[in-house]
Amino acid sequence: MTRRACDLCPLEAFCKPATLNVQRTSKHRPAEEMRSDKESQSIRVTIVQASPQPSDLASGLRKALALIEEAAEHGAQLICFAETFLPGYPAWLDFCPGAALWNHAPVKEVFAGLRANSVVVPGNETQALGEAAARLRVGIVMGISERVRDAPGHGTLFNSLLYFAEDGRLVNHHRKLIPTYSERMVWGQGDAAGLRIAKVHNVNFGGAICWEHWMPLTRQHLHNAGEQIHIAAWPTVHEMHQIASRHYAFEGRCFVLAAGQIMKASDLPIALTPLEALDPQTLIERGGSAVIAPDGRYLAGPVFDEEIILYATLDLQEIERESMTMDVSGHYSRPDIFRLQVTASDRGDDISGK
């Protein structure tokens, strides 16, 4: 058998995808009674890699709630979803060149559909997610396209992450700081009000959305906050996104849950024509979800091209061991030379746990 160069590398374990802790939605190991506490210093985490329902928020929410229930039944304590899973990432921005045409009636209709199916915070969807979190005693991180209803900016959508604690409280609400490239046609700029950590089962967790992982000061701010678990929300976790997620884990000495979703060409709006002819079954968002350790190695995944639930039990003491060599907010930093100032004004959200 021919061996690849990486098979001979002493860092082989770091480069290769993990083969453990990957479970399909139809098959699960017996549930494990895992609850994080000071004695066990562990937490059971889950990434739900699934197909959204781009034109039907209600159906997408029902699917998400069913998957949350399933994951909780199998021991999950923290459950996360991909970028804008509700109602689904607007992949037509990447595949349909007509999306950028000025005053183009079809694209305005598609945008109106995205707006109608975006989540109001607080609203019926956040109530349902909070109730599920409280009933199942799990933390939930959900990527949404957010619509402002009764406040300034009511004509603007945001790319957001919602964080629910195990008691059902919405403990953080982050809006993506800068929509990336074509995303600026549908989403507005966010703020730093949600750029902070929250707690689930007494563990510090935070997150960032897509290309925020290439904003060095954003990373430093979250590292300074003391993340133990970081949710990296992507539409799909392709090679460069894998690199960014693993770099974040290594740099921040934290666990990273890199979450992607599955979308087919058939999910593109009929009103817009793709740049090239695509078979309806062609995958345009391929998943790639993975759980990454504080030293950058894979604990679960990455898994591509299928709907799946990934599980991993995280040993939080691993953070303590890895911090011996790197602490970018402590012994591997120079605050006497560099200073970071963050303007995080209060957005006015009624969010507990600040």
Question: How would you label these PLM feature ranges?
Answer:
Residues 120-121, 125-131, 146-228, 234-247, ...:
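Active-site catalytic loop in hydrolytic enzyme cores
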Residues 35-78:
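N-terminal glycine-/serine-/threonine-rich phosphate-binding loop
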Residues 57, 69-166, 235-238, 242-252:
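Cys-nucleophile CN-hydrolase/nitrilase-fold catalytic domain and related Cys-dependent amidase chemistry
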Residues 261-354:
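C-terminal beta-strand edge segments of enzyme domains
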